[in-house]
Amino acid sequence: MNKVTKTAIAGLLALFAGNAAATDGEIVFDGEILKSACEINDSDKKIEVALGHYNAEQFRNIGERSPKIPFTIPLVNCPMTGWEHDNGNVEASFRLWLETRDNGTVPNFPNLAKVGSFAGIAATGVGIRIDDAESGNIMPLNAMGNDNTVYQIPAESNGIVNVDLIAYYVSTVVPSEITPGEADAIVNVTLDYR
């Protein structure tokens, strides 16, 4: 080999060796693709919840709530055979991942969906909170629910599970600062089987 070729090869080896030594760690991805998963039992996959109409004066203080409105996410075709979860448990269960992709959350209130308007002017000074109906736990938005809110898929369920939730408005300002208008929001639902 000539001197130029040897120098070029030595330079390339040094370049690649430097890249290999420059790492500070590694990321190991672990997961599983399930053969089947629960499906929302509605043709358009949309659950509509009518929260009602309220006077701003009904919210007397910051944190005041409207009446709680129960609703259900009906699921079918859920897998009934258990699998290993992140916590090591082997069971047929899932958690909810609720995302506010369109409007986000109310600033300084990460678990309140920011309201907007589907047709008109949006109200301000309130947000929408979602709770688990059974436990009363606040459902986190844009974050994974904790292990305290896990929905089991019983073997005798034939793959049918109802997720019962509650929604309501919560004021984030004093009544004089609430502006009237539409108080709508969309929250996207993902079932997480970790």
Swiss-Prot record:
Location in the cell: Fimbrium
Keyword set includes Transcription: no
Induction record: Expression is negatively regulated by H-NS and subjected to cAMP receptor protein (CRP)-mediated catabolite repression.
Disulfide-linked positions: C38-C78
SUPFAM superfamilies documented for this protein: Bacterial adhesins
Main function: Part of the yraHIJK fimbrial operon. Could contribute to adhesion to various surfaces in specific environmental niches. Increases adhesion to eukaryotic T24 bladder epithelial cells in the absence of fim operon.
Official protein name in the record: Uncharacterized fimbrial-like protein YraH
UniProt source species: Escherichia coli (strain K12)
Encoding gene per record: yraH
